[in-house]
A protein has these predicted regions:
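Sec-dependent signal peptide recognition
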Residues: 2-10
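Subset of outer-membrane beta-barrel
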Residues: 20-314
């Protein structure tokens, strides 16, 4: 039992550093999956694109994804930690779309130590989530969506389970290319804890909009996230982004996440600096059946992250 306690303490310390969170479990669910979303600041829920990865951010948006699209994703994170995901989206009648998705986070191998820092061995940790989604066009302008997700986490010989639901709503005015969305992510909780103490899953209430300037290649987006948590200033809820749409097939994107920049500030001899954390960049190529998106950002002061999305319509 003593060995198990120190195992858990060691892991929790590591994972809190990785996730930049201290109040919830399964914080890998907060990481962006879409490279396009990552490039726009990491929290976008309102872009209207034929992009299957949007299933992970707002289920209401998959109505615009091509029928029978398969999607594979990979993200580099901190050293030793990697994450991968996949999705499949299919039309269901004239107004409906369904999809399935999965996420996998591998934290690598970590040291198991005692209270006096004696190494007792090594252990691994990983998180897995599988989900089913459904979106329906409520009218020509409104779409709604729901995702039901099963989550499991393994730490050495210990594991936990949880269930969560995402609810999404989108309003899209095609003639002015204005999109407004609201999402409630991770409504639910643990059904099996590591030990006897149950933890919360990362509930996140978000609202956002995207607007393309008429007769212009520029589209701007703004998203307010974690509106259920007001423990920090209103500005830190905001992420902003802009797309430069060079053609119907090519775009470049950039964004800024104010919360991430604030959380990752560190002090040195020259003062405080976030070392470019908060800034994100990306781009994509969208052909008739093949799509490639790449996004770059920093989610930890010690490492850069690269997200690659590949989608193919069967």
């Amino acid at each position: 039992m003593k060995r198990a306690v120190f195992t858990i303490i060691s892991l929790i310390s590591t994972l809190l550093t990785v996730a930049q969170e201290s109040q919830t479990a399964y914080n890998f669910l907060r990481l962006p999956v879409s490279a396009h979303v990552a490039a726009l600041g990491g929290d976008n829920i309102s872009i209207i694109e034929d992009d299957a990865t949007l299933i992970f951010h707002n289920p209401a948006l998959i109505n615009d994804v091509s029928d029978r699209t398969i999607n594979l994703n990979y993200m580099t994170y901190m050293e030793g930690a990697k994450t991968a995901s996949a999705a499949f989206v299919k039309a269901a009648g004239e107004r409906g779309t369904w999809g399935v998705s999965a996420q996998y986070m591998d934290y690598g191998t970590m040291k198991e130590v005692s209270w006096d820092n004696t190494q007792l061995g090594e252990f691994s940790a990983r998180d897995i989530a599988v989900a089913g989604s459904y979106a329906y066009a409520l009218s020509n302008r409104f779409s709604g969506g729901i995702t039901a997700r099963f989550i499991t986490s393994h730490i050495a010989s210990y594991h936990s389970m949880a269930v969560g639901i995402d609810l999404g709503l989108n309003y899209y005015l095609e003639e002015s290319e204005l999109s407004i969305s609201a999402v409630a992510k991770n409504l639910g909780g643990q059904i099996k804890a590591y030990d006897d103490e149950f933890e919360r899953i990362p509930l996140d209430l978000q609202v956002g909009f995207s607007k393309r300037l008429l007769n212009s290649p520029l589209r701007f987006s703004a998203t307010m996230s974690r509106l259920n948590d007001w423990s920090y200033g209103i500005g830190k809820h905001l992420s902003v982004g802009a797309d430069l749409i060079l053609s119907p097939t090519i775009y470049l994107a950039a964004g800024y996440n104010f919360r991430r920049a604030s959380e990752m500030k560190i002090s040195d001899s020259e003062g405080e600096s976030s070392h470019s954390a908060g800034l994100s960049l990306g781009g994509g190529l969208s052909l008739e059946r093949f799509k490639l998106h790449i996004g770059y950002a920093k989610y930890h002061v010690s490492a850069n992250s690269l997200i690659i999305n590949v989608s193919y319509t069967l």
